[in-house]
């Protein structure tokens, strides 16, 4: 009886009123969580937010009274919830905030150990002309006349960049970056826009960032999970302007990804980024944008090539080039590539153009020789059985004739296979060298036909702190 009274008191304190019988029956199972929220030290939290404000939002006017008011209003929000679903959303978000904010975002205001600026000194200009020639050979489709929808950038982005730069240094075991921001550390000629990151705790991180922005600025932030990309979450402001995005990956994947440390932060090994860039260029809309982005892409490609040549000891004067045979099965939407020349742990690879077909194969075959899922890093699983690799190719496949696959797609397919080898650190030497040297053989081939990529099904799910919605 004493325990029941104690539970009732805790729920009553949380709601600021007597719970209904339904509320009591549901909330009594959450009483430990509720008790922690009731006992949360809002005064300490206030001082922590002030430190974040002074470090990351210096130019913003914010009085202590207004900040305290916003904190009090949010931690009283459950008292005004009309529906049980909203009450649960409030409680879940409050629980995440009180249990993770300090170690996720709060720590960014503490003194960081001194570090020395470091970079890899390579002569990237030597690859600039080669990169120009490679991209010129890829410039084989007309620019699209369709106006592409590009996300509008929120005015909050500058603040978030400062937070992300600090976060990458403090949380290097759970977060690493890739893309133009990471490559800027290798070659300062590379301009960057977004800071692209992979994380093992993306959901918790983004919720805490959303709360920080809410308390400091009063702005509404929405987190949108996109079904078409693996564990991809976008952050929008109240006008759907883009704030940031991130991919979530498992800790196992994070540990496997080859990475290098520059300025106390980890970046995805540029060889992995090179292979993903070559792979992505098989996507028709990327080729349609090539002319408009030529200079920017050329600097990036030249940097990635020079790093890969140096780090993986690739002799460019060797006469050995890519020797693979590729064949499309139009009805089954499957491409078979023969890798017989190379000493791999398989002889050929089936690239499914529909992900569901790969998943069917994996589910029907429990006795696989090898299996890996690198999630968003490769956007596919890899399975090996009886000297054959099975994987999924997520981009458009280009044809040079009715029955011949275009060299751009052959390079992309090879890159996709190589991602498996470079990440697992085995059997990549000869194939990687041949691919890099083959890129330098300029052959401008028109695109005869485009095999579309598969269409993903699903719906967007959201987390909206302001509206008390949590659907992912």
UniProtKB/Swiss-Prot annotation:
Belongs to the poxviridae poly(A) polymerase catalytic subunit family. Its EC number is 2.7.7.19. The active site is at residues 194, 196. Heterodimer of a large (catalytic) subunit and a small (regulatory) subunit. The keyword ATP-binding applies. One of its GO terms (molecular function) is ATP binding. This is Poly(A) polymerase catalytic subunit. Keywords: ATP-binding, mRNA processing, Nucleotide-binding, Transcription, Transferase. It comes from Fowlpox virus (strain NVSL). It catalyses: RNA(n) + ATP = RNA(n)-3'-adenine ribonucleotide + diphosphate. SUPFAM superfamilies: Poly(A) polymerase catalytic subunit-like. InterPro entries: PolyA_pol_cat_Poxvir, PolyA_pol_cat_sf, PolyA_pol_nucTrfase_Poxvir, PolyA_pol_nucTrfase_sf_Poxvir, Poxvirus_polyA_pol_cat_C, Poxvirus_polyA_pol_cat_N, Poxvirus_polyA_pol_cat_N_sf. Gene3D superfamilies: Poxvirus poly(A) polymerase, N domain, Poxvirus poly(A) polymerase, nucleotidyltransferase domain. Polymerase that creates the 3'-poly(A) tail of mRNA's. GO terms for biological process: mRNA processing. It is an enzyme of class 2 (transferase). Pfam families: Pox_polyA_pol, Pox_polyA_pol_C, Pox_polyA_pol_N.
